[in-house]
Regions:
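Histidine- and/or cysteine-centered catalytic micro-motif in compact active-site loops
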Residues: 56-59, 96
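The transition from N-terminal targeting/processing segments to the mature protein
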Residues: 22-27, 91, 121, 131
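Nucleic-acid nuclease catalytic cores
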Residues: 82-108
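Active-site-adjacent loop/helix micro-motif of nuclease/hydrolase catalytic cores
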Residues: 60-78, 102-107
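Charged, structured surface patches that assemble and position nucleic-acid processing machinery
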Residues: 109-141
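Short secondary-structure capping micro-motifs at structural edges
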Residues: 39-42, 73-83
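N-terminal, charge-rich interaction modules
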Residues: 1-57
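Short, surface-exposed beta-edge/turn micro-motifs
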Residues: 48-51, 88-92, 128
Length: 142
């Protein structure tokens, strides 16, 4: 998984206070700028950030695992520093299991949605997405 993410993401230490800790923390920062006549006159700058936390579950994924990761990511999003250049941040929690994932767990993860606007969206927004990966049958649930 690390090899696939290497092209677009930088790997960093996970943020402090995450419990459970992700096995891998990947960050992608993208900046878009519009200039007028030369690069010294910038009309606007926007930042789009993406964060991916990969969790390897040794046994079956449980509802408590999803709830714990959801609460941690909610806290991270709430503490996200934003400025006038921030446009969007997407947080993805990927839980990977060698055991088959129950349909009830997939429904629980699908129901977990979180969106936060900063300053009525004037300083951007942040979204949380869950991905459950079932290695036993080779399927990803989004």
């Amino acid at each position: 998984m690390r090899d696939r993410l290497t092209a677009a993401f930088d790997f960093k230490e996970p943020p402090q206070g995450l419990n459970p800790q992700p096995a891998l923390w990947a960050v992608h920062n993208r900046t878009s700028e519009k200039y007028f006549l030369s690069k010294s006159i910038s009309l606007y700058t926007v930042n789009n950030d993406e964060y991916v936390g990969l969790y390897g579950c040794t046994d079956k994924i449980k509802e408590t695992d999803i709830e714990a990761v959801f609460e941690q990511f909610k806290r991270l999003i709430s503490e996200l520093p934003t400025d006038e250049k921030h446009m969007s941040s997407i947080f993805t929690a990927a839980l990977i299991s060698k055991e088959e994932i129950d349909l009830k767990i997939v429904e629980t993860a699908s129901a977990k949605k979180f969106h936060k606007d900063f300053w009525f969206s004037l300083r951007g927004w942040a979204d949380l997405a869950f991905i459950l990966v079932d290695l036993k049958i080779g399927r990803a649930h989004v």
